[in-house]
Amino acid sequence: MAAELLFNCEVCVQVRSQACEERRLNVRVNVELLSISNPVHKKDLAVRLTDDADPFFLYNLVISEEDFQSLKSQQGLLVDFSAFPQKFIDLLQQCIQEQNKDIPRFLLQLVYSGSVLDHTPVSLNVVETNPFKHLTHLSLKFLPGNDAEIKKFLARCLKCLKEDKMTLEDKLRKTEEDFTRQLSYTQQSLSEKSRELDKLKNEWTSYTAALTSKHTQELTAEKERALQAQTQYQQQHEQQKKELESLHQRSIQQLQNRLSELEVINKDLTERRYKGDSTVRELKAKLSGVEDECQRAKQEVVSLRRENTTLDAECHEKEKFINQLQTRVAVLEQEIKDKDQLVIRTKEVLDATQEQKVILEENTEKKQSHIEKLETTIKSLSAELLKANEIIKKLQEDLKTLMSKLKLKNTVTIQQEKLLAEKEERLQKEQRELQETGQSLRMKEQEVCKLQEQLETTIQKLEESKQLLKTNENVITWLNKQLNEVQMLKRMETPSSMHGGIRTALSPHGMLERPSFPSSGISHTISPFYAFQKFAEPAHNKNPSPHCPVPKIQFNSQVSKIDQHSDVQVVTAATGHPANKENGDNLGLESKYFKKKEDSIPLRGLSQNTLNSENLKPYLPKVQPSLPAAVTTTSAYFPG
């Protein structure tokens, strides 16, 4: 005989009886299909009603094909025996779906014909409710289980409980082994990560201290240089103004003297009148040229002032950039502190899990001892039950012969029933305790899963912090490189091709003087422009050590023709870098930091057309082939 389980679930049932009021009861409905092959192949439908809280609640129903035909004719069913089990299960599922509602559409009713204690047949009705009428779709009669069936049912329940207990013990052992391995591995990884964090902290503190000291020194040096350059520019502008005014006054006096001489000559010599007028016109043209030169000199003063303002703005931008870097360093220190706190929290959580593990082990030992005691009690109960069965058989045999001793035997049976009831209560308590231990084990498994997730998150955060530290180190190295490039300015080379009365010399602060013209009284200087830009280092400059770079400046001067405008440009080459930094990589920064500024104004020289060529001839140098100038590039701040 083979049994196929079709349905096994708890259903809320409405219990009706004549002796007591209506009440609701959770009943487990078990539907099985029994196939019998000896001597004829048959299929029977077995339905069993049980209560998990009451082990003596047992009602059975076995429907064969012949019984179903009579049931079909009595209740007017339209389904064959092969489709009846599925339809019955569908009705039960509809009852389960509707049982939590206030007014369910489908109900299961368990109706007792007599009292509950009489062990009379019970009818199970599937009822559909509507506002007009209650319709019974199906009504099945169940027989109460006898002592043998109840004993079989109890033995089956005990067997299932033992199997569940064995599986739970195996799971406990496996989980304990897994947890011990995982805890040992996590402890090792945590110790390694804590060591790495300590090393990183020490390196970071030393590195930040060195950086702050370097940056402060460099800032003070740059500020002093900017102030010195500003004072020098102001002094030079004042000197140029005074010289131009004196030259203008001298030229005016000379012209007035010549005019007076020409008037005397006109009075004396009327024949040379036209020549005097021509000389007067020439002198007027010279006056206009001198005035144009004065206006151009004023324009140069205005352009120099603008350049001073641009340099001040660049200094302010660099100070802002340094402040931003200091704020970034503070943010990174705060992130490191937060990660330290996270590590401390994870350590606390691990300690708590270890304590919980110890408590769980103690509880499991207690439960195992308690289960062993329960097994001994169950064995004693089974032995007592066997003895009780033997006594009952003997009493049944003696009933036929000894009617006079019925009262005494009845008292003995009552006492035995009391003992059985007490034993059954103990069994129920033990079943409840087993359920509670299973629930506690599930809770502990969930807690362990949560702890594993927390450990994984902490490991991910540690990896992210390492990546952040690497990016910060790259940013700091780039900043050091930029600040070193700003510090290193190259010296200016004096041109060797100048001749005669033209003076070309560097002032103590890097100023280049223009040639002075004593006949006209004009003498002014050229102010250099420092461009902070990287160039490729020549091969012969790679020998100095990277720790002590020597600044070098390239200057290319050319003397143009007298009738053309001359532009003076000073180009500064980049300082020598260490061998490993010649390529000038950007270290992950954006390209906006390397863009050129195109709003600067170049320095233009005074026009030489306005000067008298006859006065300048003895002071002009002979054009010589100049030395090959170094390769110059346009400045990022002063192009063109």
From Swiss-Prot:
Share the domain note from the entry. The 35 nM long coiled-coil domain mediates homodimerization while the globular N-terminus links the dimers at an angle of 40 degrees to form the inner ring.
Using the record's annotation, list all stretches that form the PISA domain.
Answer: 40-92
**Which terms does the UniProt entry file under GO BP?**
centriole replication; spermatogenesis
- Cystine bridges: none
Under InterPro entries, the record lists: SAS-6_N, SAS-6_N_sf, SAS6_CC
Xref: Pfam families: SAS-6_N (PF16531), Sas6_CC (PF18594)
Please list the coiled coil stretches: 154-475
Q: What does this protein do?
A: Central scaffolding component of the centrioles ensuring their 9-fold symmetry. Required for centrosome biogenesis and duplication: required both for mother-centriole-dependent centriole duplication and deuterosome-dependent centriole amplification in multiciliated cells.
Species in which this protein is naturally found: Gallus gallus (Chicken)
* Keyword set, alphabetical order: Cell cycle, Coiled coil, Cytoplasm, Cytoskeleton
> GO CC: one term?
deuterosome
Which PANTHER family does this one have?
A: SPINDLE ASSEMBLY ABNORMAL PROTEIN 6 HOMOLOG (PTHR44281:SF4)
Subunit structure of this chain's protein = Nine homodimers form a cartwheel structure with an internal diameter of 23 nM and radial spokes connecting to the microtubule triplets.
Query: What superkingdom does the record give?
Result: Eukaryota
Q: Cellular location of this protein?
A: Cytoplasm, Cytoskeleton, Microtubule organizing center, Centrosome
Q: Provide the taxonomic classification.
A: Eukaryota, Metazoa, Chordata, Craniata, Vertebrata
Name recorded for this polypeptide: Spindle assembly abnormal protein 6 homolog
